[in-house]
């Protein structure tokens, strides 16, 4: 903030709350906050196999007579080897994953269970890499672009792995 011209105004209650906060409460409450509309590809690595999903856009089809679809409205769908795949639940699973604790200062000590690389149409962050490593029987350590960030429930990682496996088989 030395060179910043922005003036930060905080009242005493906010300052005290910040000073008294436990470090864990300052960590993010999501594993990945992502605008999926910027994704140009999602690569999943399972058991040494790579699967590349790519988004495509089409005119939205009217589902029911009761639903009004705007003319020219588009929807995104995902392809794997030219075949459409329902990737929505996988994307939701990634963004809804909740950390169980911080992984600051930790290093992966077991094999990687899953690697997801998201290529993006974003010059500042053209690629985001999430790796999930078994940590304990209950936890997986998550790295974001190579840096350990949080611990997550291993059952959530297993469910994500299974969901991706169903899409690629």
Language-model features: where?
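Soluble, acidic/polar mature domains that operate outside membranes
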Residues: 1-169
């Amino acid at each position: 903030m030395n060179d910043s011209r922005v003036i930060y105004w905080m009242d005493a209650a906010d300052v005290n709350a910040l000073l008294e906060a436990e470090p864990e409460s300052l960590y993010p409450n999501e594993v990945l906050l992502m605008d999926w509309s910027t994704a140009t590809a999602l690569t999943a690595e399972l058991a040494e196999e790579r699967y590349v999903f790519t988004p495509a856009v089409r005119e939205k089809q009217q589902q029911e007579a009761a639903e009004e679809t705007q003319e020219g409205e588009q929807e995104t769908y995902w392809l794997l080897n030219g075949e459409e795949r329902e990737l929505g639940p996988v994307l939701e699973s990634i963004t809804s994953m909740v950390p169980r604790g911080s992984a600051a200062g930790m290093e992966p000590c077991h094999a990687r269970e899953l690697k997801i690389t998201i290529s993006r149409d974003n010059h500042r962050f053209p690629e985001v890499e999430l790796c999930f490593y078994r940590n304990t029987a209950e936890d997986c350590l998550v790295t974001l672009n190579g840096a350990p960030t949080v611990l997550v429930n291993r059952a959530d990682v297993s469910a994500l792995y299974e969901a991706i496996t169903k899409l690629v088989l």
